């Protein structure tokens, strides 16, 4: 493909009409640096097919600059920017003039007003109307380009949160993909405004990333972050603090709940140059809880999700099935709690795997991976799972496995009982009819006979009733869970939806997507 630079809407639209391709759009204001190049490189790496084009825009948006800010001074060098963009993998560049983006002037077009609860935090507290200008221009660019995907950096975290919220509320059908802050060898976050710094200012400004890195290191050791100490370091290096806060990464409001994902956010002035930086604070790796009724496809999808994102996969349903199989194989009455306690007390339950795909479950060194999927186990597992001793035993085992995080678990009470502090909770469900069809396919594939889909649907409804009405850890959607109804969706569709939800809650900086 011949690399192109367009300056008018007409040129761009003519070219787009010839491509018949999905557009991956990366908006910039120019002044490109390795951070921008990283976004382009990642967008290229994660193309889902060859029929996708990476378009980079270069437009210094006057609406996001207040009076007295650096609009006129902002770096502009289209030739250098084009060279950096193309070398990173961009297919085309759109560098429009103001009149191309706002024909007749900005006053001739609708403007977006960001909710004050989001705008007036952090950067927006000092930069009045800044994010209104950002949101307005993004909508204009999206309207002109009509991309399938928008790629943004996590360095401008507040901007990312606002744009995600904007797209969600306006139901804009564009996927947002974000990537972590990139830094030079000294740890300094790349920014177009870094070029403003004199040599001596650059030395002073180095205390910004150094202090943030040290604070995160102390936090990871279990120590309390001392904001006063950080402020004194900045003062010693002639950095004027605009804000220095620990905030909730989504509401952007100050928080003292450091048991959840937090953001240490900083903005300082070094001379006349404004610099921002941040780091995420988390006591452990993320835990993802996926709950839902029988036959909703939890195991298949959760396993694929774990593989795609590099998580440990914990199939809690398989654990209950393994215990049920053990009880059946030893001819124990499912209501004889004394015998059940005795046999489980000395039993060894473990997962073994050489890969995510080949994960197997063993009980007392017997591979029961296939045995636990039999109709006999299926019909009895709910009776066994409702017993207090069984649930307490397996819940403890599950919590030990998830002690350090980095895990995705699926079951019926993961988000409510096993990991109530999970970082993301999904309630995956489908209609009983849909689940019966899936169950029939699964039984057929495994070589088991069944009477009819209608009977399977009846069994599923009975299982739902038992699971929902049991006194101990009943099946229910956690209050803070996101419900995903999967009727009519294939595994790939559900997986994509789950990953999008995950990325809206867990930044790349916290949990990077593994390279394929």
From Swiss-Prot:
Annotated segments matching region Pantoate--beta-alanine ligase: 1-279
Binding site for (R)-pantoate: 64, 159
GO BP, one annotated term: pyrimidine nucleotide metabolic process
Active site: 36
Keywords of the record: ATP-binding, Cytoplasm, Kinase, Ligase, Multifunctional enzyme, Nucleotide-binding, Pantothenate biosynthesis, Transferase
Positions with a binding annotation for beta-alanine: 64
Pathway(s): Cofactor biosynthesis; (R)-pantothenate biosynthesis; (R)-pantothenate from (R)-pantoate and beta-alanine: step 1/1
Reaction catalysed by this enzyme: (R)-pantoate + beta-alanine + ATP = (R)-pantothenate + AMP + diphosphate + H(+); CMP + ATP = CDP + ADP; dCMP + ATP = dCDP + ADP
Annotated region described as Cytidylate kinase, given as residue ranges: 280-516
InterPro entries the record matches: Cytidylate_kin, Cytidylate_kinase_dom, P-loop_NTPase, Pantoate_ligase, Pantoate_ligase/cytidylate_kin, Pantoate_ligase_C, Rossmann-like_a/b/a_fold
Binding site for ATP: 29-36, 153-156, 190-193
Cell compartments where the protein resides: Cytoplasm
GO cellular component: cytosol
Superkingdom: Bacteria
EC number from the UniProt entry: 6.3.2.1, 2.7.4.25
Gene Ontology MF terms: ATP binding; CMP kinase activity; dCMP kinase activity; pantoate-beta-alanine ligase activity
Its job: Catalyzes the condensation of pantoate with beta-alanine in an ATP-dependent reaction via a pantoyl-adenylate intermediate. Catalyzes the transfer of a phosphate group from ATP to either CMP or dCMP to form CDP or dCDP and ADP, respectively.
PANTHER family (alphabetical): CYTIDYLATE KINASE, CYTIDYLATE KINASE/PANTOATE-BETA-ALANINE LIGASE
NCBIfam families hit by this protein: cmk, panC, PRK13477.1
Family, similarity comment: In the N-terminal section; belongs to the pantothenate synthetase family. In the C-terminal section; belongs to the cytidylate kinase family. Type 1 subfamily.
Protein name: Bifunctional pantoate ligase/cytidylate kinase
Organism: Prochlorococcus marinus (strain NATL1A)
């Amino acid at each position: 493909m011949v690399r192109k630079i367009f300056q008018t809407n007409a040129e761009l639209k003519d070219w787009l009409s010839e491509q018949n391709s999905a557009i991956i759009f990366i908006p910039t204001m120019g002044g490109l640096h390795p951070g921008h190049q990283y976004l382009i490189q990642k967008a290229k790496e994660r193309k889902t097919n060859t029929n996708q084009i990476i378009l980079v825009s270069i437009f210094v948006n006057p609406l996001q600059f207040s009076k007295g800010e650096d609009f006129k001074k902002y770096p502009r060098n289209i030739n250098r920017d084009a060279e950096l963009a193309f070398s990173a993998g961009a297919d085309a560049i759109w560098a429009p003039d103001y009149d191309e983006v706002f024909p007749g002037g900005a006053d001739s077009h609708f403007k977006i007003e960001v909710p004050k609860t989001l705008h007036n935090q952090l950067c927006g507290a000092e930069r009045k109307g800044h994010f209104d200008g950002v949101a307005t221009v993004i909508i204009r660019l999206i309207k002109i380009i009509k991309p399938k995907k928008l790629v943004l950096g996590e360095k401008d975290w507040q901007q990312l949160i606002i744009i995600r919220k904007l797209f969600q509320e306006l139901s804009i059908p564009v996927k947002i993909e974000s990537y972590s802050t990139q830094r030079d060898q000294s740890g300094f976050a790349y920014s177009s405004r870094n070029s403003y710094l004199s040599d001596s200012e650059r030395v002073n400004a180095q205390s910004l990333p150094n202090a943030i890195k040290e604070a995160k290191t102390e936090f990871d050791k279990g120590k309390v972050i001392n904001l006063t100490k950080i402020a004194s370091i900045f003062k010693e290096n002639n950095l004027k603090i605009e804000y220095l806060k620990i905030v909730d990464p989504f509401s952007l409001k100050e928080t003292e709940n450091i048991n959840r994902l937090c953001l240490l956010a900083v903005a300082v002035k070094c001379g006349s140059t404004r610099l921002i930086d941040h780091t995420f604070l988390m006591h452990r790796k993320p835990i993802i809880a996926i709950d839902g009724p029988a036959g909703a496809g939890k195991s298949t999808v959760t396993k694929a999700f774990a593989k795609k994102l590099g998580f440990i996969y914990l199939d809690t349903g398989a654990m209950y099935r393994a215990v049920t199989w053990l009880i059946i194989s030893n001819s124990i009455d499912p209501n004889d709690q004394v015998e059940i306690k005795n046999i489980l007390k000395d039993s060894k339950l473990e997962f073994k795997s050489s890969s995510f795909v080949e994960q197997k479950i063993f009980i007392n060194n017997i591979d029961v991976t296939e045995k636990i999927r039999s109709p006999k186990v299926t019909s009895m597992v709910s009776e066994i799972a409702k017993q207090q001793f069984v649930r307490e035993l397996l819940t403890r085992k599950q919590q030990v496995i998830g002690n350090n995080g980095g895990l995705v678990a699926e079951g019926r009470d993961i988000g409510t009982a096993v990991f109530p502090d999970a970082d993301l909770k999904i309630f995956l469900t489908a209609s009983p009819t849909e689940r019966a069809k899936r169950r029939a396919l699964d039984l057929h594939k495994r070589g088991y006979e069944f009477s009819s889909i209608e009977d399977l649907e009846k069994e599923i409804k009975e299982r739902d009733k038992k699971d929902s009405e049991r006194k101990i850890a009943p099946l229910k959607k956690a209050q803070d869970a996101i419900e995903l109804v999967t009727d009519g969706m294939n595994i790939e569709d559900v997986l994509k939806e789950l990953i999008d939800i995950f990325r809206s809650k867990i930044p790349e900086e916290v949990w990077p997507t593994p390279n394929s």
